[in-house]
């Protein structure tokens, strides 16, 4: 089963051989970010179903490892401490750790490596593994008009994901063809199943949390005076892109509404989000601010504890979707068809502007004063949350009646 690296996709005979092949040592590469890690969970589940006896490891950053570590389909996590390279005084130690990581990957003798990250660094990990089969996405294709029954989008950004980047496709023995860009990231990742012979079962995004994580979340809430029986709304106002931030007043308005309704309201985020969360908490007295106090796994535990989560387009949105929780996400510069909550278009709130989505990351790039986010009001979000909670309550009552 030797494929030619230079071929853009596998030949028919080789594809059939690959689908019928068995592998005993598998490495899945998707270090970050949180949302992308969640998107990769269905690939892990289908790998386990396809190769039930194989050892399946995941190369991932330490901060995201706890989100996947307890997954029953996973054998082991391989930690890539990427952030150490940017810490002063830690770079020499980071380089030593990096070489140790390369040796660890090489010694594992993987026979199948799947690179879902598609950058030069992740491709290097795939290449250094020495695996006889290395799979990743093909080179970028041309972007075309987005057509979707779920969202009517009037703008097609000229940039964004179009395939493997930075020449990473050169490292792969088999490349995943890219027939279209008009597809959600989860479905795109599952295209690897065409090469490996995955089953046709619906994608399983379930996050498996440890009992320790659940206890830690309850401790954090108790310290803030939230009773275990009190209904909880979680607001996650952070995101990496400047343009994906909904307004401070928008989140504060949502918080004030649900505080009046008798809910506990918790803010969650990383240390980077602390200034934003402090402003929201100040504008909505009674809100408990947990920003900077939770890991990604704690965030998942907090959202699982909640009645509903309200987010930007961020990893927290995908965590909420994976947990099956009622949630609402505010979208502006990005495309909900590609990276929205999976198969939950009703959870997206956005205004219909001809410039959206644009995929601009910085506010300085926007010539319209961030209109796509500023025009989304707290009343719009509250109305959508109430509708989703009402629908969830009706479904739960119906299921309860059926089970009796």
Stretches found by the model and what they are:
Residues 1-404:
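Catalytic machinery of carbohydrate-active enzymes
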């Amino acid at each position: 089963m030797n494929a030619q690296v230079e071929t853009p996709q596998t030949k028919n005979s080789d594809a059939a051989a690959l689908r019928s092949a068995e592998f005993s040592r598998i490495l899945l590469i998707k270090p970050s970010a949180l949302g992308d890690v969640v998107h990769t969970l269905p690939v892990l589940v289908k790998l386990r179903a396809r190769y039930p006896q194989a050892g399946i490891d995941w190369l991932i950053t330490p901060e995201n490892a706890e989100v996947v570590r307890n997954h029953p389909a996973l054998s082991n996590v391989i930690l890539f401490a990427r952030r150490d390279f940017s810490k002063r005084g830690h770079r020499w130690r980071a380089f030593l750790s990096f070489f140790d990581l390369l040796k660890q990957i090489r010694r594992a003798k993987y026979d199948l490596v799947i690179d879902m990250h598609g950058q030069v660094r992740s491709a290097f990990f795939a290449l250094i593994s020495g695996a006889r089969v290395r799979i990743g996405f093909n080179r970028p294709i041309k972007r075309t008009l987005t057509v979707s029954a779920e969202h009517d989008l009037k703008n097609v950004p000229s940039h964004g994901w179009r395939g493997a980047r930075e020449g990473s496709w050169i490292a792969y023995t088999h490349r995943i063809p890219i027939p279209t860009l008009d597809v959600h990231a989860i479905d795109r990742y599952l295209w690897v199943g065409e090469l490996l012979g995955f089953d046709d079962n619906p994608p399983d995004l379930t996050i498996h949390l440890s009992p320790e994580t659940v206890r830690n979340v309850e401790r954090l809430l108790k310290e803030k005076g939230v009773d275990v029986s009190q209904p909880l709304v979680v607001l996650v106002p952070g995101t990496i892109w400047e343009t994906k931030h909904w307004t401070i007043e928008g989140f504060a308005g949502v918080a004030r509404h649900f505080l009046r309704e008798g809910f506990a309201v918790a803010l969650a985020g990383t240390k980077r989000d602390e200034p934003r969360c402090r402003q929201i908490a100040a504008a909505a007295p009674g809100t408990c601010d947990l920003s900077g106090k939770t890991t990604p796994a704690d965030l998942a535990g907090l959202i699982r504890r909640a009645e509903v989560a309200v987010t930007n387009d961020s990893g927290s949105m995908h965590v909420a979707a994976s947990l099956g929780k009622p949630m609402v996400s505010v979208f502006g510069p990005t495309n909900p068809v590609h990276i929205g909550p999976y198969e939950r278009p009703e959870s997206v709130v956005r205004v219909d502007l001809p410039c959206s989505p644009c995929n601009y990351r910085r506010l300085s790039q926007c010539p319209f004063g961030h209109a796509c986010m500023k025009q989304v009001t707290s009343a719009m979000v509250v109305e959508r949350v109430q509708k989703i909670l009402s629908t969830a309550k009706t479904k739960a009552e119906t299921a309860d009646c059926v089970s009796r």
